[in-house]
């Protein structure tokens, strides 16, 4: 892998990188202060910068063609450009993300207990309904009960990660447990009598346990990804688990698997806490702080802790400019968008692009 370019405008740790769902030439990045920057990947400069939240942004997604963000300031927001059109209070006592399913279902840590789950439905006219409240996954697994609403102090610790694979919602916990849940959304039952009157019976949504794995126990889950339609997970140790049958365990070179990126369903790109990235035989190392035993420590060494990774895949180049500017834009865009690019965020606020 070779370095292509670096994006620099954040002054705080990068917490999320999200390719724009509406433009292949744009990119969203977020940091630990709640700042979001929309980038033009051709000019490699910010297009829009706004203070979306007052604390770390944990998630970025899309719902009904609008940007959705989730922060440790206990809010989930939906945006029309930089205007917030909907705000949902949430519990962000942990560092878990949120997940959007079927473009209208939102899975979040529960507002009552961040160790549990809430399920919401958001319609295209921005009506909010809580379908399932404070579901305790631990009880669901241990008791084998299918239920709609329950709360308890018995659990697997805080929720660390949520990830969707083939309509199964995987939840990774502080304990190291991973639970796969299927969301059942029954259709209303319509009954008719002889007078042509209709009775509509709404059935309650349910979460059903489809998978449970404890290989990572007692180490917290810190990364989840998809590989060949199968869940892949990493923890604070040097172990990556591919959740196929039978389960495959891969020992890696370092502890702290911060990020796992699926590359073309052929290989995994692994990013570690210490800033190192590994892909096949390729290794990228970044400087990290060193502990010294004397008073003349070199404090000038830059901290390059890796915080986030995502893959930018080639897309068709589009341009709205004309003349020489259009030609220049197409040439630069072609260089970016015909190459698989790994975008890596670091604690110092930089985003580095590597050619894969």
Curated annotation (Swiss-Prot):
Pfam families: WD40
Name of this protein: ASTRA-associated protein 1
Annotated organism of origin: Candida tropicalis (strain ATCC MYA-3404 / T1)
Gene (name only): ASA1
Role: Component of the ASTRA complex involved in chromatin remodeling.
Complex and partners: Component of the ASTRA chromatin remodeling machinery complex.
Localization terms from the record: Nucleus
UniProt keywords, alphabetically: Chromatin regulator, Nucleus, Repeat, WD repeat
Gene Ontology BP term (one): chromatin organization
GO cellular component: nucleus
KW Glycosyltransferase (keyword) present: no
Ranges: WD repeats: 9-49, 52-89, 210-242, 243-283, 317-356
Protein family (similarity comment): Belongs to the WD repeat ASA1 family.
Keyword hit for Glycosyltransferase: no
């Amino acid at each position: 892998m070779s370095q292509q370019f670096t994006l620099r405008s954040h002054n705080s740790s990068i917490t999320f990188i999200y390719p724009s769902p509406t433009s292949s030439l744009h990119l969203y990045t977020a940091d630990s202060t709640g700042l979001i920057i929309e980038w033009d990947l051709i000019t490699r400069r910010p297009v829009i910068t706004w203070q979306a939240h007052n604390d770390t942004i944990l998630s970025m997604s899309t719902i009904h063609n609008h940007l959705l963000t989730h922060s440790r300031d206990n809010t989930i927001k939906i945006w029309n450009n930089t205007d917030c059109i909907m705000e949902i209070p949430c519990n962000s006592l942990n560092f878990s993300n949120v997940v959007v399913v079927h473009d209208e279902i939102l899975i979040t840590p529960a507002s009552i207990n961040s160790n549990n789950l809430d399920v919401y439905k958001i319609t295209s006219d921005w009506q909010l309904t809580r379908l399932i409240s404070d579901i305790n996954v631990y009880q669901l697994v241990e008791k084998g009960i299918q239920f709609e609403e329950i709360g308890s102090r018995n659990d697997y610790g805080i929720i660390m990660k949520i990830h969707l694979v083939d309509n199964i919602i995987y939840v990774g916990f502080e304990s190291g447990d991973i639970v796969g849940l299927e969301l059942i959304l029954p259709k209303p039952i319509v009954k008719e009598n002889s007078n042509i009157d209709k009775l509509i019976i709404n059935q309650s949504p349910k979460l059903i346990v489809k998978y449970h794995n404890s290989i990572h126990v007692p180490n917290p889950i810190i990364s989840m990804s998809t590989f060949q339609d199968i869940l892949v997970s990493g923890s604070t140790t040097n172990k990556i688990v591919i959740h196929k049958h039978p389960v495959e365990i891969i020992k890696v070179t370092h502890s702290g698997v911060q990020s796992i990126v699926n590359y073309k369903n052929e290989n995994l790109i692994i990013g570690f806490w210490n800033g190192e990235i590994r892909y096949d035989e390729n290794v990228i190392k970044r400087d990290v702080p060193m502990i010294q035993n004397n008073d003349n420590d070199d404090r000038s060494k830059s901290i390059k802790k890796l915080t986030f990774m995502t893959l930018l895949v080639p897309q068709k180049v589009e341009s709205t400019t004309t003349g020489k500017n259009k030609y220049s834009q197409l040439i630069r865009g072609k260089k970016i968008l015909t190459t698989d690019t790994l975008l890596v965020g670091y604690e110092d606020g930089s985003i580095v692009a590597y050619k894969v």
